[in-house]
Amino acid sequence: MDMKSGHSSPVMTDSPPISNSRLTIRQNRLPYSSAAATAISQNNNLLLTVPRKKTGILDDVKSNGWLDAMKSSSPPPTILNKDNLSNDATDMTYREWMQLKYPSALTSFEKIMSFAKGKRIALFLDYDGTLSPIVEEPDCAYMSSAMRSAVQNVAKYFPTAIISGRSRDKVYEFVNLSELYYAGSHGMDIMSPAGESLNHEHSRTVSVYEQGKDVNLFQPASEFLPMIDKVLCSLIESTKDIKGVKVEDNKFCISVHYRNVEEKNWTLVAQCVDDVIRTYPKLRLTHGRKVLEIRPVIDWDKGKAVTFLLESLGLNNCEDVLPIYVGDDRTDEDAFKVLRDGPNHGYGILVSAVPKDSNAFYSLRDPSEVMEFLKSLVTWKRSMG
């Protein structure tokens, strides 16, 4: 499809405090502060130097709140009755949160589309927790055929990209739609559809023959691959005796899942990770939904990936463009913030069944509501003629 000319309109209360005495993550492994980090000139100004700090944070997790953060990183599932209605007393709190702060993108759909009229929509979607449910086994996070059909249909009318923390190859395997843009490793591995281009102003954009076709790739962290491969092997070896742990290779980052690890062994998981990466100052440790992630220290995130893709589509800094980003994870907040505060004004839509603070404008409860939203976009576009 013509991504440039064919679209006339186109917990997070995340973490209570945990003490370092209970979980001894060394302070020099805590990630950089974006305010304190300084870019150095080489490598397209992407590599950052990381000042050593006496105290620090693991992303937005206070350094004295590690174990509690691990406990609260994935809320328990809401129990539904036979009519799929929540029996949880906190459901009232959720409805109040939705009504007062983050209105449903479904009930607000007409309002969103009134703003979209005459604009070209660009759509960005997270994968896990957005297009597929969060599952116990990461390798089994399959999207339904109905969801795949919804994504395929919406991509007929709007340029569409999947931006995931997974490796690009893995998320492509799950989605299996060649007409999309894919950004794996939290946006550090971007691939265009066949016949479409990426922003060639960046020196790291290359053309390759992959998956039976010519595609363009942008990989701002490519020089980190040997280091990440080495750390991956070490993490697999050091955690092999911890029952339930899974080390996932996401190419430009590594995920250590502890969702299936007994809680009494969580500190052991974290200590194993720290023991491996303590000698790698160019890597940082972040925290997600029952997962520890190791990433390169570069000035790149999902928000910058959105801007890069908009540039590639010829849609950057255009008043007649409406970017929409749908995601459920804290890493999606960088994209929400770009659309809220940056020149590419658009709408972030948070997927969450629990109240949390966000940079998003709207909310959806779960992947089933995401699918309904995508179908509504298609219906709206078709009605416009």
From Swiss-Prot:
Induction of the gene: By trehalose.
Region spans: Disordered: 1-21
Cofactor or coenzyme needed: a divalent metal cation
CDD domains assigned: HAD_TPP
This protein's UniProt keywords: Hydrolase, Stress response
Entry comment describing in which tissues the protein is expressed: Expressed in flowers.
Pfam families reported for this sequence: Trehalose_PPase
Keyword Hydrolase among record annotations: yes
Pathway assigned in UniProt: Glycan biosynthesis; trehalose biosynthesis
The reaction(s) this protein catalyses: alpha,alpha-trehalose 6-phosphate + H2O = alpha,alpha-trehalose + phosphate
One BP term from GO: trehalose biosynthetic process
E.C. numbers: 3.1.3.12
Name listed for the protein in its UniProt record: Trehalose-phosphate phosphatase A
Organism of this sequence: Arabidopsis thaliana (Mouse-ear cress)
Source taxonomy: Eukaryota, Viridiplantae, Streptophyta, Embryophyta, Tracheophyta
Gene: TPPA
